[in-house]
Amino acid sequence: MHRSRVYAVLIDAPRDEAARAVAFWSAALGVTARPLPAAPQYTRLHQALPGVNTAVQAVDDAPRMHLDIETDDIDAETARLVALGAEQVSQWQECRTLRVPGGHLVCVLPVESDAETFRAQANVWP
C-alpha cells in the first residue's frame, strides 16, 4: 500500500521567456510571484491554486505544463501509473518523469509537503 497526491502544477517556459511568463501568470491570476532562492529555475505563484504549489519553471525545452505527484513509494506509484498507460521517459535522482496518455508529462517525486498535509490529502492505493 502506498499514498500519493498532486503536489504541484508547473508552467514550463523556455528560459529566455520565463520572466515574461511569470509576469503574465502573476497578473492574469492576481497572485504574487516569489522566486525560490534555493531553486532559481522556479518562481512560485503564491496561492494560485490553494493547497497545490503552482510555479513557473524556466526550462531548456519547449513550453508546456506538467504535474508533480508526490508519493511515499516512488517505485509503486511509477508502476501504478505505467499500468494505467504512462511511459517512463527519464529519471533524475529520485524523481521519475512519465509521459501520460495525451502526451503530457508527470513527475513522480518523494513527499515534499509537510507530513500533516500529505496524510490528509493523499490517496491510498493498494
Where are these regions (language model features)?
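N-terminal beta-strand motif that seeds the catalytic metal site of vicinal oxygen chelate
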Residues: 1-22, 65, 69, 112-126
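Vicinal oxygen chelate
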Residues: 15, 62, 67-105
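Alpha-helix boundary/capping residues
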Residues: 25-28, 81-85, 122-125
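Conserved short beta-strand elements that form part of the metal-binding/catalytic scaffold
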Residues: 29-65, 105-115
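Sparse recognition of residues in long alpha-helices and their boundaries
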Residues: 41, 83, 118-119
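Core segments of cupin and vicinal oxygen chelate
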Residues: 1-51, 76-77
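Short low-complexity, flexible loop/linker segments enriched in glycine and/or proline
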Residues: 103-107, 125-126
